[in-house]
Structure formats: C-alpha cells, structure tokens
Curated annotation (Swiss-Prot):
Protein name: UPF0182 protein Cgl0786/cg0896
Transmembrane region(s): 19-39, 63-83, 115-135, 176-196, 215-235, 262-282, 290-310
Keywords assigned by UniProt, alphabetized: Cell membrane, Membrane, Transmembrane, Transmembrane helix
InterPro entries hit by this protein: UPF0182
C-alpha cells in the first residue's frame, strides 16, 4: 500500500580519490608532454650544432626568473591573505546582519585554509610565467656596456637607457602590480571577514573599517605610493624617448613643464605615502583621503594643465624657435642610432651640376660594361625550367645576387642553389619513405652573369635567345671536365654540391621539415643522380638510433613510421630545422635576421650567408621605426616575413655575419661590428658563441653583401635626416621620399621601389664596385632628388654615398622615366602587338649615375608565352632613358646607341649566326624519355648538309609530343640546317 510519501533524495556519490588523482595526472601529462618533447629534442638539436650553452643559459635564466617572480608574488599575496585572516574581527557582531556576506561567514571561515593556498599559488604561477619572459632584459642588465655617448639632457651614458633603465622599469612595474593585487586581496578579504562595512542609510548604520583593515590597507597603499615615487623618477628619463608629432625626444614643453612636474609630483607622492602610513596611528582616514585628492588634483593641474597651457600659449606661436635645440638633438641621436652620421655617409652636394658629355658617359666602363639585364625577381621560372633537372628540385621565387671576377673584371651574377622542393613531390614521391629518406637533398650551385644572355632574341615568337648563360657546379658537371673547369675558373666549383639545408627545403607546407639519413645496412637509399644513390656522411643531424630519441621525434612530428620503418636504423640521424635563417635565430635568440638569405661558395662548399642585427627598442632622442614597414616594398609588400624580437626599434647595427653550411648545417657567427656595445653585452651573456671578425676568411669577406633590410631602414631615415638644420627640418621642404616602383604589378606601384645590387663605378675611385643602390625623389614630387649607394667591397664595405642633385634644375625620376619609355611609339606599338600571345614583364628599373654627372635609366623587358604551363621568361628588349631620350632595342648596345652613347664599353654578346643555342633541358623530368634536340653546326659539304637536315627532321618528328619549347627548338634547328646547306651550295 502506497503511503504517498516521497523518498528522500539519495546523496550524490563522489568519485573515489584515486580516480580523481588518476584524471589529474592524465591531465598533467597531456599538458606537460608536448613541452617535454620539445624541450628534449631542442636540447639534442643544440648539442648537434654545438650551441648547447645558449640553450642552457636561456633555460636557466628563465627558470631562475620564474622562481624569483613566483616566490615574491606568491609571498606578497600570501602575506596579504595572512593579515586579512589575522586581523579579522572575532565576533559575528562585526557583520551587518542585512549584509549578504553575513550568512556566508561560516562557509568563508571553513574555506580560508584552501583559499590561502590556491590564490597565492595561482598568482605565483602567473607572475612566474610573465617574469620569465624578461630574460633578455635581465641578461642585458647583467652584462651591459658603456656606449661612450651621453644623452644631451642628463648627461648619462646611453648604456643606462639601453641596459639599466629597462631593468629598473621591470622592477618598478612588477612591484606596482604585486602591491595592487595585495591591496585588492586585502580590500575584498576584509569585506568578506567583516572588517569593512558599508553604511546603511535605511537603518542609519554608519560605514565601518576595523583597525586591522585600516592598518593593512594603509600600509599597502603607502608602499604602492613609494613605488610610484620611483616611477616618477624614472618617468623623467622616459621623456627622452617620447614620440612627438614632429620628432622623437623631450620637447620644449617636456623639458620646461613635464620634467619639473615629475619632480613636483614625486614630492607630493612621497607626502601621500607618509599620509597613508600615518593612518596606522590615526583613526581618522581623512588625512590620507585628502592626500589622495591632492595627488589627483596635482596630476591634473601640474601634470596636464600646466604643460598644455605652456604648449598652447608659448610654444605653438613660436614652435620653430622653441623646438630648434630639441630637433637638433633628435637629428644627432637618430643619425647615431642608425649608423648614418657624417662619418658613415658621404654627401656629394650638387652632383651633376656641371656639364657631362656623352663621351664621358661612354667612357664610364665600370658602370656601362656591367649594366644588369637579368632580374632575379623574374627569372626563377627560367632557372627552374632550364636547370631543374628533376621535378623535385627547385629554386626560390626570388633569386640572389653576388659577384665574381671574370678575366680579372668584377661582374655581378644571379646565383641560386638547386634545392629540393618538398612541395613539388608528386604522387608516390610523397610517400613517407620517399619523402623523408629518399628525396633528402638538392644538388649544385648555379650562377648566371647578370649582363649576358645566350643569344639576342629579336623575334618574340622564337624560342631562341634571351636566356641566361649558366655556370653550374653540381654532381653531373663535376664529372665533366670542361664544365668543371668553367666553374673552377669562376670560383664556384664545389667539392660537396649536395644541399641538405636551405630555405626552399624547409618550406614544406605541412611543417614536416625533416630528413632521415644514415646507413641502414641495406646500402645507399638517398636519391643522388639517375645512376647513383647516396648515404649522408656529414656531421649534421641528431642521432635517432636509440629508441628513446626515436620515440621523442615520433611524438614531435606525430609520425608513427619513425618507430616502425626499417629505414630507421641504429646509424640513423634526423636533419631538421633546415632553414638557415631559422637556425641562426635559434642559436642566437638575441639577433634579428635579415629577410634575404643568399648562397655562395666558400672553400669549395655551398654556404648560406645570413645577416644578423642587434637592436634596441629606443635611445634618447632617436626616432623609432617599424622594421616591418621599413622593409615593405613592391617585391616584399608585407615586409620582413618572419616574426621579430621587436618590430619597433630605435637602434640597429649589422653586428653579426652568420654562415650556415648547406651540407652539414654548421652555424658560424662572426663579429662584424667591433664597436657595437649591444653585441659586446650579448657576447658577455653567451661567451664563445660569436667568433672574432678577424677569423673571417678573405674568400668569405669577398662575398659579404651590405644587407637589404638595414639599407631600407637607413634610406627611410636618410629621406628625412639628410637635413642637419633644425629650421629646415621643421619646415619639411628638404625632405626626400623613396619612389614607388613603376614596374610593379597593378596595385603595387605605390609601394616603394626595392634597392638593387649592381656592379658600377665606385663613387670615389671610379673602379668597379659591388653596390646596393636606390634613388630618392622629392617629397610628394616625382623628380629625382638624390641617389644613395652602399659599398659591399671588402676594402670600402659599408661606405654610404649620397649624391645630392642640384635644386636649381630638375632630373626625371623613375616614374617619369618609365612613363616616357612606355609611351614611346615603338614600345607602345610592340606592347600592343605582343600582349595578345605573350605575357610581358618589366624588369628592374635601374637608376645609374654615369659619367660623373648624368643619370641613366635601364629596364629589361621579358616575354613569356601565354597559357603554357612550361613557358618561362626570356629577355626580349632593353629600354634606356637618358637626357629625355628613349632607347629601345634587343641589346643594350643598340639601345645606348639610340640615345647617343657609344656602346663600345657595353658588355654585350655578338649575335652568332647559326651556332648559338639555348641551354639544354634534356635532363628535365618528363613522363616519357624524349630525344635531346641538338643544334647542328654549319656543314662544310653537301653530304654533311643533307645529313644535318635529315637529323633535324628526325629530331623534329621526335619532338612533336614534347613541349612547345622543345618543338620550337627543333624547328629552329631545321631552319639553321637548311640555311647552312644553302650557304654551302
């Protein structure tokens, strides 16, 4: 019989403590395991590259900082909670019975012990994680150096601002935040414990603060105000890096109003702190309350209103005169910070003011004979098609420039390493075994003289001519005596042409940048050539022969095959972190690296050269700049492509040259600026990691380049800071700007024109010199104002020359020259005719000072057949602009002749009748083997002529199913065979 009663609810069973602990341990493992795997594999990697000291120093520093910050923050938080519980009222009568806290008093009391543990631990962990990120600041402070240069206001060495001030700021800000947390804990805690009661107007109950609560809050607030006193003192120095509308640094208002205001507020803050401490003994809280009101009013009146009034009524009406001294300080400091002082930069005023004859221009052989026709930004597809060999090899989208001597003369070359392209692997090549154990490395070094092509391309429809003349050193050419001798004569013959490390190799879109190499016991398995395999013998790589290491890397890359595959044996090693720039940044975490990495040949080995910068966030009166914005141009619209230690800088030096071996990944760092105090500080942090500059070999020094990113930053600064008069600086009328790139694709022409590496006449000696150059236009004007060059030659490295054009005459700027060239009748006619079946590419528009006083513009035009996947650019025409005249021809010599310059010094080829050929592409990977298309030589008899025609016909038939380029070459070969036969009759 039902009673109608509802059974009592069953109590919820809690899971056993063992289960809770198991889940907690699993969660902890999931959280810590990835960090542990990364830590262990990185530790192995640093050992491989012999930079484990860097890894250890960084880890130890971060751990120590974590512990220090965690202990201090945890102790301060615990102490605040301890005093809350110690000073809480003992009686329940301390509570307002209407307060919502009243009914929870017992629950709060029961939770005290747990809260006293959880909150300090949480705050400690948070503070430790934040604090350990400041390891660079701490190490710089411990190893700081004097600059030998003092600021213009306080007379303190720049070393104080670079090394000491950031550390003092870190301490002050950290203490301030900890005390704020302690104050909030005390405030909330005493309210919950009944030590603080809000008044109740309905019951007439007054607000109440217990003596204990008043004491704790007053002491905490007083300590915070003392930290604020220190903050006001440090604020004085921060004024020197303040960014104003016209310049960076303390202005007239800052020095005459803000600086005294900081001192006054400092004194007031000290009295406020004393007032807070007085509340310990006085029951009346009105004294600290009035002190706080005084502090706030003083901040508004003295810290804001007074400077504002001085600025409005004294400075603004006379700004040019009032700010003159401080603008001069900004000019001096900025020039020092960016290495553009008068000691670093030579200005040639009124360059070109005199008359320069065409004969003088023609005699400028150092420039005229080295005019660059090959654009490294355009020719990557051409290199790929003609020098790829196999589908899995490739070249970067932007090739590099270097220089070599040819017959005793300096020439610039487009250079590239033939790398493995993991993103080009097809079908079964992408299988894990093939990708990571077979296709492991690239092959060879390619160089093409930048002022030459194989043959003149006069007809846009012909497949002959307009292509680079390559010098190659790879596994295949080393086996052929003639090609090996060519490479050796140029100085690029490599004893070890295999490329295991490079930016393209490391560009895998899935992030799986690694290769597994070593003897597996079954013989060589790595692809080397069509007829041979290879086993890696270099020192690079981390041992994964033991199961622990293998398991760790399997976890790192989430790849089970590492544990199961027979290709991984006891002698196996894993090569990873293969991007040269990333390797340098990892072993030198204090360096910012240049965005351009380039290959060269040193001591018979392919080496990657990486430029490293030491930077500072700011220096007194130095204008700050964004590295991302400064490096943006038409070629790099997004600026430097990798994360930076800091984007905004106020000081930069190219203090380190780094070299990465393409075969074994060895990283070498060389000191390159012996005067840089920042580098000296970092060498103190990481001793024996940077080699002395004296250890740079002559061969390496001959291939060092003035870095592009630094040059871009300096040209941005020189656009303004070429002005040394404060009055002129204030009016802006002598500022320059970097012109846009008129040859860029639609939508990018307003982006800055990139600088170009060229071989041209040295501004001082007139001898051939490898330089980085850029033009300047007037501010918001298109006329040319100046021309800047930086030398890369070993003897004159780093010398910057700025040719300043006369202001009483005008010289056409790059955009005006481009408009004139493209609007000339013949150019416009050809462009209209050719664009139907060809893509036309405007090459680099070079602005070349010639003859000691004239400007010559040169621009190559490239054509590429439309709608053909296998088509690639070739040089079709050369445009020149000189003294308002346009030259337009298939060769630079003809184009120069059209504008009145004798081309006898122009490096040019002779159009060979019937013997010139395009570089062979017979090694290019295809689906079916096709006979190579050969070019017959001129026959000497009727029988030989007939035989040559028959051979050409056979090759034409064989090439029918090949690419358009192969078929076109076969047609050309047939035409030449017929011509040769007819000429022999």
């Amino acid at each position: 019989m039902s009673t109608g009663l509802t059974p009592p609810p069953q109590p919820i069973k809690r899971p056993p403590k063992a289960v809770t602990w198991i889940f907690a341990i699993i969660a902890l493992v999931i959280l810590i395991a990835p960090m542990s795997v990364g830590f262990y594999t990185d530790w192995l990697w640093f050992g491989e590259v012999d930079f484990r000291g860097v890894f250890s120093k960084v880890i130890v520093t971060r751990i120590v900082l974590f512990v220090i910050f965690a202990l201090i923050a945890g102790f301060v938080t615990w102490l605040a909670g301890y005093f809350v519980t110690k000073l809480r009222p003992d009686e329940m009568s301390a509570f307002d019975t209407q307060s919502p806290v009243y009914q929870y008093r017992q629950m709060i009391e029961n939770s005290l012990r747990r809260v006293m543990v959880i909150i300090p631990i949480f705050v400690a962990l948070l503070a430790g994680l934040i604090g350990q990120r400041s390891w660079r600041t701490v190490q710089m402070w411990l190893n700081g150096q004097d600059f030998g240069v003092s600021d213009q206001q306080f007379g303190l060495d720049y070393g104080f601002y670079a090394f000491d001030l950031p550390m003092l700021r870190l301490i002050a800000d950290s203490l301030s935040m900890m005390l704020i947390v302690a104050f909030l804990i005390a405030l909330v805690g005493h309210y919950l414990m009944g030590g603080i009661r809000a008044g109740n107007q309905m019951t007439g109950q007054k607000s109440f603060v217990s003596r204990g609560a008043r004491t704790q809050l007053a002491v905490t607030a007083g300590l915070w105000m003392l930290v604020k006193v220190a903050g006001y003192w440090l604020d004085r120095y921060d004024l020197l890096t303040k960014e104003n509308s016209t310049f960076t640094g303390a202005s007239y208002t800052d020095i005459n109003a803000q600086l005294p205001a900081k001192i006054i507020l400092l004194v007031i803050a000290l009295f406020v702190a004393i007032a807070f401490f007085s509340a310990i003994f006085l029951k009346d809280l009105r004294i600290p309350g009035l002190a706080v009101v005084l502090m706030l009013l003083s901040s508004v009146i003295i810290g804001a209103a007074w400077p504002l009034m001085l600025e409005r009524f004294s400075v603004q009406p006379n700004r040019a005169e009032k700010e003159a001294e401080y603008i001069s300080r900004n000019i001096e400091s900025t020039r020092y910070a960016y290495g553009i002082t008068d000691e670093d930069v030579t200005y040639e005023e009124n360059w070109g003011a005199g008359e320069t004859t065409n004969e003088e221009v023609a005699a400028d052989s150092a420039t005229i004979s080295n005019i660059r026709l090959l654009d490294p930004q355009i020719l990557s597809p051409t290199f790929t098609q003609q020098q790829q060999l196999r589908n899995f090899y490739g070249f970067p989208d932007q090739l590099a420039m270097d220089r070599f001597e040819v017959d005793g003369k300096l020439r610039d070359f487009v250079v590239a390493a033939r790398e493995l392209d993991p993103n080009a692997l097809q079908q079964n090549q992408q299988d894990w075994i093939n990708r990571h154990t077979v296709y492991t490395h690239g092959n060879g070094f390619i160089a093409a003289q930048a002022n030459q092509v194989d043959e003149v391309a006069r007809d846009v429809g012909s497949t002959r001519g307009g292509y680079p003349v390559y010098t190659v050193s790879d596994l295949q050419s080393n086996a052929r005596a003639a090609e090996s001798e060519d490479a050796e004569e140029l100085g690029i013959k490599v004893d070890e042409p295999r490329v295991y490390y490079g930016p393209l190799i490391a560009s895998a879109t899935d992030g799986a940048d690694y290769a597994i190499v070593g003897d597996t016991g079954d013989g060589p398995v790595e692809y080397d050539t069509d007829t041979s395999s290879y086993t890696y013998e270099g020192a690079g790589g981390v041992d994964i022969g033991n199961m622990v290491n293998r398991a760790m890397f399997a976890l790192r890359y989430q790849e089970m095959n590492m544990l199961l595959s027979d290709r991984v044996g006891s002698e196996s090693k894993i090569l990873f972190e293969r991007d040269p720039r990333s390797r340098v940044e990892k072993v030198a975490p204090w360096l910012t690296t240049d965005s351009k990495t380039y290959p060269t040949v040193i001591d018979g080995r392919i080496k990657w050269i990486v430029d490293g910068y030491t930077t500072l966030d700011s220096l007194p009166y130095s204008t700050r700049t964004s590295l991302t914005e400064a490096t943006q141009d038409a070629v790099m619209p997004d600026g430097t492509p990798q994360p930076l230690i800091t984007d905004r800088v106020g000081y930069i030096r190219n203090s380190v040259k780094a070299v990465v071996d393409a075969y074994d990944g060895t990283v070498e760092l060389y000191e390159f600026d012996t005067e840089d105090p920042v580098l000296k500080a970092w060498r103190g942090v990481f001793p024996d990691t940077v080699k002395d500059g004296s250890e740079i070999s002559d061969e390496l020094r001959a291939h060092l380049r003035y870095p592009e990113d630094l040059f871009k930053v300096q040209r941005d600064m020189l656009a303004k800071y070429n002005v040394d008069d404060s009055g002129t600086f204030f009016t802006n009328d002598a500022f320059w700007s970097v012109p846009g790139d008129p040859t860029a694709a639609e939508g990018r022409q307003e982006l800055k024109q990139p600088p170009y590496y060229v071989v041209a006449a040295d501004p001082e000696t007139g001898e051939s010199s490898f330089q980085l150059i850029t033009p300047f236009r007037g501010l918001q004007r298109e006329y040319l104002s100046a021309h800047m060059s930086a030398s890369s030659d070993p003897v004159t490295y780093g010398e910057i020359t700025v040719r300043v054009l006369p202001t009483d005459s005008v010289t056409q700027g790059p955009k005006q020259a481009q408009d004139a060239m493209m609007s000339s009748d013949q150019v416009a006619q050809d462009q209209t005719l050719w664009r139907g079946s060809n893509d036309l590419h405007n090459g680099n528009l070079l602005t070349l000072p010639v003859g000691g006083g004239e400007i010559l513009y040169v621009e190559p035009i490239y054509s590429q057949r439309k709608d053909q996947a296998s088509a690639f650019p070739k040089l079709l025409r050369v445009l020149v602009f000189y003294k308002g005249q346009v030259g337009y021809a298939p060769t630079i010599a003809e184009a120069l002749s059209q504008v009145g310059i004798d081309p006898k010094e122009a490096q040019d080829i002779e159009e060979v009748d019937g013997t010139a050929t395009t570089p062979s592409t017979d090694e290019t990977d295809t689906d079916t083997d096709q006979p190579a298309t050969e070019t017959p030589t001129a026959p000497v008899s009727e029988a030989e002529g007939i035989a040559a025609i028959n051979d050409a016909l056979s090759n034409l038939e064989a090439a029918r199913d090949s690419s358009f380029e192969e078929y076109g070459r076969a047609l050309d070969a047939l035409d030449r065979a017929v011509d040769s036969y007819q000429s022999a009759q």
